[in-house]
């Protein structure tokens, strides 16, 4: 977002002084400060405060007669000793009550008003951190307050420190602001009680000095005086609120008296006089508030110092809440709207929090419509792209309050809902909370339309639809909203290909599933996996000719895309229940803890015993739809299969693995084959299934090898043209052989050499983007075959063959990295090369304890390999920066073109590209570390990436290079 402050137009009228200036032109709060303490606390670009407009005639002074023969001379040298002020000392003494301080001052004022006023002004100067004092000569001439303060300022500029009570970290000022606020509250209260607020000039005398100080070019004086004025205005607002309440009570009493059959004239006159006095006092307070708003707030709300701006905006929020009859109007709200574009994070955050309170106040809603239409676009922008995460989160909460008031259109609500896919977890979680509230309100409206919940359940209980749950309405609404969100981001072939690569290991959580995991934590209804499972399996949507049943069933009938989201909701529900409800203690120190662990294991076994039949039924139901079948298989990814120990689970597993075998051998969808492969690997961790699974996998591999030889045995794979029909067959066959090589050691197969040779020939084909998926499978299969190679301890005579086969694969990979037009295929070749090297070195380290043996062959990272890898990484960093819309930081000095793939600028693509860059960076740094080739130049290259591509990549670089 742009962090400059834009000038708001004044729709409500007002003079130039009431319009905000452009902060980016007038000041920079984040600019570096001078080494001089006086320059630190001096602002040359401040806006001078105008004097208060209201001045009453001054009565004769009471107290000691003083000769006014000379003005107080301000010395230029700093006094050697700290000037003592009893009020300041009392304020710092935590044992002295602030009310006692206020009462004591008024007692002094009654004895000698001029000395008391001078003492109070000196107290304010002490609060500013100013070791200067005025005397009664200065107090007597109020019109010269500004000139006197200017002399004081000139004398202290050279000696002033950056530290003053309001911002000091000194322990003696720990509760300074809190006690100062209490003192000012008691001070205003005593002014009102003693009638000085309405019938004396004492308040104006004090405020004339405070207003003058608020325009000081010295930051400590200006800040402290502004805080004084703002707090006094706050307590004037409270007093005004009390008067308004008294006026309302007196008015009711008067009306009641006038309606009596026997009118009491004395009582009526008394009430009229009371009302007149209240109105007079209220008018006085309103005049004070207007005067000090114009003379202090209008100038200080856009002060160069962010802390002053924050104080102004916070207090404005308090004033509006306290006396809306005075401050709740567009002419005051506009100041908050203008400051939504402030360059300072804290200021923007303060405004958002203040506004949220207004939108959550029912009595304010009607008066906020114009403000919303004028500033909601800016608030939505802050939610989506503000530079600070805290501001974004607070803005989303404000958007939710505005939505509740009915001030957001559907298209604007969708903008916020799209943030559930944001890359930042805090923003994502807050957006999911927003989503849950939208769903709840929509569902409540529908249930009210169809009748109460009890009425709906009673209607369904009279039918054969016994599995129905009213929660289905909520699940349906969630799926429909998420469909709208997901379809608002146009997917692309490149995105789908990248996603398929990183979903291969089964641990990659889709953005929708991640959002639903947050929803499960926010609302426990989404953890009802049994209700969701029954909903997934429900098929009876035929009309019953009864309302509201038909209307509800029609609403709950989902399309394939929505069903896919429902399956992801079920996956999130299962994962939440498995992870959150069954936490085994890390250590068991006693019998009771051991019994608790056993009970938890039994509960988990019971959960799996109930859950597996549902999953088997769901996979069988969705076997005809590749997308839904893939989502169904992913349900098992959410479960820790190693914890399934109950013997009763065996029959469910038997059905499951037979279904997986059928899906693996008969389905040509790549994701289905990959999903089955992952599940076979995970099921192998269950001891009771090992033998049966081994036989089943052997049978699958035998059939797959036969299929491979049939398709590729006599086919000229390197040069022949592949037709569309052949491509479909080859793609499925290669994906199956890829899965089989992950499951079983193929090094003993007699067909090993021909499989290896055919795959190498396939990688040597002329680049053709249409055939990329074939090469993806070939690369992955060769990686698995090399892994089995590395695990074997062959005779020395076989070492040459292994090196030759390894060299062939590496040459194919480097050829793809340097020459292939497909950037994603280049990425996969680079990842495979790095993973193979890491795997090889790990196997060697486990086979040989002699470190010298491992380090003998650290020649695998040849310069041409490293150059190719760095260019590929730099290309993806460029793409990440482009999609993420942040500056690109070069990694190499190469002039080769950067990676260009078809990805829109949206959170989905940004999240995926972050994953790509972090994955590639970590693997590259591991390989460079293993090769002992980290040079100072190389370290410098990667160190410069820190801070440019997000915290995750920076953490990876720090871990390896620090």
UniProtKB/Swiss-Prot annotation:
Residues 21-30 have a biased composition (Polar residues). GO terms for biological process: cell division; chromatin looping; chromosome segregation; meiotic sister chromatid cohesion, centromeric; mitotic sister chromatid cohesion; mitotic sister chromatid cohesion, centromeric; sister chromatid cohesion. GO terms for cellular component: chromatin; cohesin complex; condensed chromosome, centromeric region; condensed nuclear chromosome; mating-type region heterochromatin; mitotic cohesin complex; nucleus; pericentric heterochromatin. One of its GO terms (molecular function) is chromatin binding. Residues 297-382 form the SCD domain. Residues 51-71 have a biased composition (Basic residues). It holds the Pfam family STAG. This is Cohesin subunit psc3. It comes from Schizosaccharomyces pombe (strain 972 / ATCC 24843) (Fission yeast). The lineage of its organism: Eukaryota, Fungi, Dikarya, Ascomycota, Taphrinomycotina.
């Amino acid at each position: 977002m742009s962090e400059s402050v834009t000038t708001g137009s004044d729709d409500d009228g007002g003079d130039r002084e009431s319009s905000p200036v452009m902060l980016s032109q007038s000041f920079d709060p984040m600019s570096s400060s001078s080494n001089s303490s006086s320059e630190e606390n001096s602002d040359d670009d401040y806006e001078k405060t105008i004097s208060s407009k209201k001045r009453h005639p001054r009565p004769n002074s009471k107290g000691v007669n003083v000769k006014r023969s000379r003005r107080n001379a301000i010395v230029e040298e700093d006094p050697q000793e700290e000037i003592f002020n009893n009020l300041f000392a009392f304020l710092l003494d935590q044992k002295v009550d602030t009310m006692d301080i206020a009462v004591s001052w008024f007692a002094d004022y009654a004895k000698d008003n001029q000395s008391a006023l001078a003492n109070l002004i000196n107290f304010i100067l002490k609060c500013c951190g100013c070791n200067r004092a005025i005397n009664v000569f200065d107090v007597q001439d109020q019109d010269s307050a500004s000139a006197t303060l200017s002399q004081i300022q000139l004398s202290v500029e050279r000696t002033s420190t950056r530290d003053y009570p309001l911002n000091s970290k000194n322990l003696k000022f720990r509760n300074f602001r809190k006690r100062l606020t209490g003192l000012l509250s008691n001070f205003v209260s005593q002014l009102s009680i003693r009638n000085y607020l309405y019938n004396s000039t004492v308040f104006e005398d004090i405020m004339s000095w405070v207003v003058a100080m608020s325009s000081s070019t010295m930051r400590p004086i200006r800040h402290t005086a502004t805080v004084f004025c703002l707090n006094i205005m706050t307590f004037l607002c409270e007093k005004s609120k009390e008067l308004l309440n008294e006026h309302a009570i007196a008015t009711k009493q008067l009306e009641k008296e006038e309606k009596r059959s026997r009118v009491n004239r004395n009582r009526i006159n008394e009430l009229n006089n009371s009302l007149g006095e209240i109105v007079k006092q209220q008018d006085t307070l309103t005049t004070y508030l207007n005067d000090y708003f114009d003379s202090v707030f209008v100038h200080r709300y856009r002060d160069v110092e962010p802390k002053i701006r924050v104080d102004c905006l916070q207090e404005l929020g308090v004033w509006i809440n306290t006396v809306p009859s005075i401050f709740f109007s567009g002419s005051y709200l506009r100041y908050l709207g203008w400051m939504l574009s402030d360059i300072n994070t804290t200021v923007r955050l303060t405004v958002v929090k203040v506004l949220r309170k207004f939108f959550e106040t029912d009595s304010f809603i009607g008066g906020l419509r114009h403000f919303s239409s004028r500033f909601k676009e800016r608030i939505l922008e802050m939610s989506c792209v503000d530079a600070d995460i805290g501001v974004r989160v607070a803005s989303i909460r404000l958007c939710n309050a505005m939505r509740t008031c009915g001030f957001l259109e559907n298209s604007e609500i969708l903008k916020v809902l799209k943030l559930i896919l944001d890359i930042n977890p805090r923003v994502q979680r807050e957006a999911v909370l927003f989503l849950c509230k939208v769903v709840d309100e929509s569902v409540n409206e529908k249930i009210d339309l169809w009748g109460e919940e009890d009425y709906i359940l009673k209607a369904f209980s009279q039918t054969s639809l016994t599995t129905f749950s009213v929660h289905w309405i909520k699940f349906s609404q969630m799926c429909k909203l998420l469909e709208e969100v997901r379809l608002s981001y146009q997917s692309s072939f490149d995105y789908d290909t990248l996603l398929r690569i990183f979903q291969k290991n089964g641990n990659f959580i889709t953005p929708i599933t991640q959002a639903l995991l947050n929803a499960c934590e926010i609302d426990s209804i989404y953890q009802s996996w049994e209700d969701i499972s029954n909903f997934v399996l429900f098929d009876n949507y035929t009309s019953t000719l009864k309302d509201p049943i038909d209307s509800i069933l029609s609403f709950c009938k989902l399309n394939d895309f929505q069903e896919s989201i429902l399956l992801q909701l079920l996956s999130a529900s299962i994962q939440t229940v498995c992870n959150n409800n069954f936490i085994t203690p890390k250590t068991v120190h006693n019998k009771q803890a051991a019994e608790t662990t056993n009970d938890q294991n039994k509960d988990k076994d019971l959960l799996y015993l109930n859950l597996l039949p549902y999953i088997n039924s769901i996979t069988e139901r969705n076997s005809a739809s590749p997308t839904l079948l893939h989502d169904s298989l992913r349900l098992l990814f959410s479960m820790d299969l190693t914890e399934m120990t109950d013997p009763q689970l065996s029959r469910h597993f038997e059905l499951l693995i037979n279904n997986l075998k059928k899906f693996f051998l008969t389905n040509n969808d790549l994701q289905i084959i990959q999903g089955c492969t992952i599940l076979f690997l995970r099921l192998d961790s269950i001891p009771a299934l090992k033998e049966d699974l081994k036989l089943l996998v052997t049978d699958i591999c035998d059939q797959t090898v036969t299929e491979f030889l049939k398709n590729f045995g006599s086919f000229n794979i390197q040069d022949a043209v592949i037709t569309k029909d052949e491509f479909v067959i080859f793609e499925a066959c290669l994906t199956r052989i890829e899965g089989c090589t992950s499951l079983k050691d193929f090094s003993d197969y007699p067909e090993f050499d021909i499989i290896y040779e055919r795959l190498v020939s396939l990688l040597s084909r002329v680049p053709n983007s249409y055939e990329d998926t074939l090469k993806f499978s070939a690369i992955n299969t060769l990686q698995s075959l090399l892994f089995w190679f590395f695990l074997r301890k062959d005779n020395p005579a076989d070492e040459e063959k292994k090196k030759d086969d390894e060299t062939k694969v590496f040459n194919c990979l480097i050829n793809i990295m340097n020459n292939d037009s497909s950037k994603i295929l280049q990425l996969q070749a680079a990842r495979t090369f790095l993973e193979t090297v890491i795997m090889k070195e790990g196997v060697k380290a486990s086979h040989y304890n002699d470190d010298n043996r491992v380090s003998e062959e650290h020649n695998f990272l040849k310069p041409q390999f490293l150059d190719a890898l760095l260019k590929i990484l730099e290309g993806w960093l460029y793409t990440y920066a482009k999609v993420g819309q942040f500056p690109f930081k070069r990694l190499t000095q190469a002039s080769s073109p950067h990676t260009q793939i078809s990805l829109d600028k949206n959170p989905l693509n940004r999240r995926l590209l972050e994953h790509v860059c972090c994955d590639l960076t970590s693997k590259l740094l591991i390989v460079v570390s293993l090769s002992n080739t980290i040079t100072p130049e190389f370290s410098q290259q990667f160190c410069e990436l820190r801070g440019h591509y997000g915290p995750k990549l920076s953490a990876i670089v720090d871990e390896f290079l620090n």
